């Protein structure tokens, strides 16, 4: 029998080398850096870096949407106006740091002399952080990145996007629905884009009893950037902000 930290190993489960040997023997294989215990340390390091970087950020709103949205389009300009409006209202603007909607929101924040944050993600196709990110961090793991989005945001603004945008939207909806975060406005921008999805939610999910009657009301849908900002400001005016740590 051998004790290995808090674990007990017996028989063939006992490794042929000690932890110190594997650390100090440079002739050993290098694939240990890809093992799960090492990944735990990398994951921990990402949390520490994210929490440390944004610990003193102050009130912030995350803006999500497609990386494929072209400059000069209505959606891009709307995201830029939302970013500027949020910054003028005293919020830092957090995005995924990429192009499209993310770039537009960061650009708007910078134009209004606000704080512009980008939380990037390692992808097979390198994108990098857009030029309007002033505070940036690149993550390896989606779930760490999503935790940082939630922890340092007081609201989510969601413009038209694809699977990644939907992932972030439903992550927030689940946390609000289950009471893990409170007083956390979720505003969808673009009634034409989102109305079909929420009609399906009302018909299929609510209609079959899979969600509560109040659950579809967890989100607001708006088209005007000024209204988006007003919804968030009004939601926070009467009490403490959710997601502030």
Predicted segments with their positions:
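Glycine-rich beta-alpha loop segments
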Residues: 2-20, 25-119
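Solvent-exposed alpha-helices and their adjacent loops that cap or buttress functional pockets
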Residues: 54-56, 85-87, 109-110, 127-131, ...
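Active-site/ligand-binding-proximal alpha/beta "capping" segment
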Residues: 140-192, 236-241
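Acidic/glycine-enriched connector segments
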Residues: 100-158
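Short gly/pro/ser/thr-enriched loop/turn and capping motifs at secondary-structure boundaries
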Residues: 123-128, 165, 193-196
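Catalytic-core regions of core metabolic enzymes
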Residues: 33-40, 185-186, 190-193
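C-terminal functional extensions of proteins
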Residues: 188-245
